[in-house]
Structure formats: structure tokens, C-alpha cells
Amino acid sequence: MSLRQDSGKNFLNYSKFILPVGAAAVLATVLGVGWYTQPDRFARGYQPEQPIPYSHRLHAGTLRIPCLYCHSGAPKSPQAGIPSVEKCLNCHRVTKTESPSIKMLAAFYTSGKPLLWNRIHTLPDHVYFDHRPHVNAGILCQTCHGEVQTMEVVYQNMSMRMSNCLGCHRSPGNALPTASASAKGPEHCYACHR
């Protein structure tokens, strides 16, 4: 056997076995490290501290203020939106005005500085989500955000991973009591990855 034939066999072994196995190992390592090091804001249970204490249990639960009163952007824009200080003061100009939290709220309003709430439900930058079709189809906020009306301090109830979205898109009956095949959400990549 000549040297030329021998080196050809080694190349075949390399390209048919070692190269694919090596590429798979590198890919698995990259995906594993990416999964493991994913920031907390994408994980279930994420509960950042907020600049002013706010009880969803009181407002959405006991007082039964609808989600869309404060998060009015949900039915008409991609983002649900965080209420402005002015929205809070619609009630708190006359209600609980001596509360330390309400005094802090009023101080933000007087100073003209924005109140920067820490976002709880966040998606990676490469994911596009539009609240409009979900809210307008009658999907309850609790489907993705959990029973917020029972939470003193809101936390991320479920992981905001693609598998959760696809679960509803493929079987909308879990989210929509009267779902039909036409109510299924799109499953193609561009629907969410833009």
C-alpha cells in the first residue's frame, strides 16, 4: 500500500467520523453553555426588586382592577406597557395619600422623573411577541403570567421558552376554551424570530 492510499483512508475516517462527532460535540457544548448561563430574567421564578412596593394581590385581587386598566397597551400594541405615574395617581391623589409608597410615587410625579420599574417578563432580543392577537383572541393574561391577582410581589410564573409558546400554538384549546383549528397561532419561525 502506498503512502498516498494510506493518507486517503485517514482522510475518509476523519471526514466520516471524527469531523461530524467533533462538530456535534462543539455544538452541544455551545448550546449547553448558552442554556446554563442564560440570565435569570428568562427563568421561572424571576422576581426583581421594584423601586416602589406594589401589591398585585391588593390591586388585581382584592380590588379587582382589570389587568388592562394599568396595562392598557396590550390590546392595541405589541407591548402591554407599564403604567405611568399619572395612571397610578388617578386613584392615589385621594386614596392612601399618607402611605410611604404613595408619597414616593408622588415625589416621582413632582420631580418629573420617570419611575423605572424592573421588567419581570422579558424575552431574548431575537424574539418578537405581540400582545394584540393574544389579548384580542380572549386569551387570559394569567395563561402566560400566572395568577397575578394572588401574588403580593409578581414573579415570572413560567419560563418564557419557545416550547411554551408552541404548546399553545399547537393546542390552543388549553388557552382558549372555544378554540378551533382556525384559532391556532402560526408555527413558522418568522412569526416570532425577526
List the predicted regions and their residue ranges.
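Hydrophobic membrane-insertion alpha-helices, especially the h-region
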Residues: 16-34
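Alpha-helix-centered segments that form part of catalytic cores
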Residues: 111-131, 135
